[in-house]
Amino acid sequence: MKKFFSMVCACLLALSAQATDIKKYDALYENLPFQMEKVTRPQFPANEVNLKDFGAIGDGSSLCTTAFAKAIDALTQKGGGKLIVPQGVWFTGPIVLKSNINLHLEKGAVILFSPDDALYPFIDTSFEGLDTRRCQSPISGHNLTNVAITGQGCIDGNGEYWRPLKKQKVTDAQWKQITSRGGAFKRADYWFPTEGALKADNSANMNVPKTPASEEEWNEIKRFLRPVMISLVSCKNVWLNGVIFQNSPAWNIHPLMCENVLIEDVLVRNPSYAQNGDGLDLESCKNALIVNSTFDVGDDGICIKSGKDADGRKLGIPCENVIVNGCTVFKGHGGFVVGSEMSGGVKNIKVSDCQFLGTDVGLRFKSTRGRGGVVENIYIDNMSMFDIQTDVITFDLYYGGKSAVEVLNDGDEAKSQKVQKFKVDETTPCFRNIDINHVICRTARRAAYFNGLPEMPVSNIHIKDMEVNNAEYGIVINRTDGVKLENIKVSAKTHTFDAKNSKNVTVNDKTYKKIDEKGITLDF
């Protein structure tokens, strides 16, 4: 009885400490311009099991897939709890999480996923906002309640065995080492891991292939069907804490249609050359808190999505009620990004106190005709940036699948300047009602770029208290309605403000009702 009483007291103390710790985020909800429930940490039973007790060997070569499955099943039979992964390198196939499971990596623990695609069966899923078939994710969970990945260890997806590679993104030594595995070349400077992956790419919609006619054809293109590393679908009460997530086959962390999501103190890494190596893609989720985390990746850093085109509109689940605070993004196509898959809508997002260091774009809003969806009520405050490769802020409704650097190098930006006006319908994307305050950046190619559609201008964007030093170009706007710039300081080598094809543009208290194709040029 005494032992039982001690265990109960220990559990109550742990729960009390956890509840107190989550209160440190209470200030983030103060004066929010939208209603949002406070995100909570999931609670788990006190049960614990150790991976080693189920036959796992942490030598980096012994396959531990069965041990992970047995350990999770054993915990589930007890009602859930903590699966302890001790120090070691645990080589494994896919891990399927269950409700009330906390996958806990102790210091020095590495979960390393096998590159053997035979271990990853095909599943029906969603990728890049489209319903499709992919390989099973290294870590996945579906329709779960209370699920966590915590600790001080590292999860590595062995992604270089899955991803295509562009020569200009790597050193000669890296190129030689990776392409020596075989595979196929789309061009002399663009490599795929198999002939089948190249075949699929030649007919794909971005990274979603044309549906094969037979199972044999599916197997032929299997390496093209790269999974996201962490796939959590329709889960409630999700917690990621303290872990390093790195080297994913495609996107790194992908919560889809989840609710009450807490991501704190994680490090998300991918090589800068990782194709589609996004850090976090929060898609069609509700009530999420992303805090004090670091991203250094090969694509978008922190990205908000909600499905693509007809599939996304049919699902119709927006990404809403999200707070991002105190995060750092190093390499990446964008620091904080919305789109391009946003067909279900995005609303009620607050981003504050973040720093972007060396990213291609700081704040990136992107979409294109065909998406549909409304992005609105986005509030951004206190952004610090340095060495931004293109724009501090981008709104571009002519997104074509390339990074901002690739668009710049290929001259695609100029191609969207003279365009036909289309009829507004459900496929027309809309970006409106976005406030951006207190932005400071040292070194960027351009301070800001607005590129709306003739039929749907980017509208009601308010930027206040922004200072950009050492830029090549200032603020360029085209096809906007209701852009307001207040207390803006830009040090650039050219004019600091250029506008055309826009209405109701306010620059430091002076409003221009209509700006035609000839445009205007000003200096702040």
Predicted region positions:
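Extracellular "leader-to-stem" segments immediately downstream of a signal peptide or signal-anchor
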Residues: 2-12, 17-84, 89-102, 106-234, ...
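Short glycine/acidic-rich loop motifs that flank beta-strands on beta-rich extracellular proteins
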Residues: 80, 94, 114-115, 135, ...
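Active-site-proximal loop/turn and secondary-structure-junction residues that shape catalytic pockets
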Residues: 89, 257-259, 267, 306-308, ...
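Short, surface-exposed basic-aromatic patches at helix termini and helix-loop junctions that form
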Residues: 95-104, 256, 344, 372-373
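Right-handed parallel beta-helix
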Residues: 107-108, 145-153, 236-246, 259-271, ...
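Outer-membrane beta-barrel domain signature
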Residues: 217-219, 278-279, 311-314, 369, ...
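Extracellular beta-rich repeat passengers
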Residues: 362-524
